[in-house]
């Protein structure tokens, strides 16, 4: 699904080049649940943004679903992002002026899905995530955990092949974190490829593989074969 070859990301300033990522080589197969870990400033979020077409590598080759990303037009990149990739952020990124229903519906509006189909898809996702009773509320009326559930629902309503999550449980307490991660595990069991960034070993254990970054470079990979204990 994903191949990264010699990926560099750097900033040139006053005749000095500062590397954020350097020499990243990585393959991720469809259906994996991968965790990216490392200290602050290691380049984790930058790598996630490159994978999600929110940023471009300075050097190297990124292949997604058989397409070489740097050869794609901006329009094509946007289409791939909307059609195949869902994003979940630590800071929810919900629109306070829109209801839960309207926030979840938004990706379908961008994709010009017809009204009747939109209504059916939103109704299905509200039911699936047990938030039908919250559909007319606004984000400030929800708890942090409830807002993140809405964020996950919005991210997957278009049935993405790839879900990217940047510290998805960073602002949540333990019970809420486990709820979100159980949700991710079920999505992964249903075939969604997931790549998450987290500092938490406990949250990392939900995946099957850990990628460690330090100073922008890949340090080592750990298979995570043990089941998460309930």
State what each model feature region is.
Residues 209, 217-230:
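Conserved beta-strand-loop-alpha-helix hinge in the C-terminal portion
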Residues 2-209:
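ABC family nucleotide-binding domain
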Residues 214:
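A cytosolic small-molecule/anion-sensing beta-strand core signal
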């Amino acid at each position: 699904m994903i191949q990264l070859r010699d990926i560099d990301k750097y900033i040139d300033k006053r005749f000095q080049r500062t590397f954020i990522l350097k020499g990243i080589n990585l393959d991720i197969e469809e259906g994996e649940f991968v965790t990216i870990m490392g200290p602050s400033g290691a380049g984790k979020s930058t790598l996630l943004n490159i994978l999600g077409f929110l940023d471009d590598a300075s050097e190297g080759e990124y292949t997604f679903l058989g397409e070489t990303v740097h050869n794609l037009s901006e329009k094509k990149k946007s289409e791939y992002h909307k059609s195949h990739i869902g994003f979940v952020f630590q800071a929810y990124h919900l629109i306070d002026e829109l209801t839960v229903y309207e926030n979840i519906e938004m990706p379908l509006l961008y994709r010009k899905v017809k009204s009747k189909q939109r209504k059916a898809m939103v109704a299905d996702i509200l039911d699936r995530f047990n938030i039908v009773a919250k559909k007319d509320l606004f984000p400030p009326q929800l708890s942090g955990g409830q807002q993140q559930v809405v964020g996950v629902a919005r991210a997957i309503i278009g049935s993405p092949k790839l879900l990217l999550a940047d510290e998805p449980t960073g602002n949540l307490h333990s019970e809420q974190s486990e709820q979100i991660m159980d949700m991710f595990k079920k999505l992964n069991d249903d075939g969604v490829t997931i790549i998450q960034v987290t500092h938490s070993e406990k949250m990392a254990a939900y995946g099957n593989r850990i990628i460690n970054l330090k100073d922008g470079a890949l340090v080592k990979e750990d298979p995570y074969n043990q089941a998460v204990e309930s």
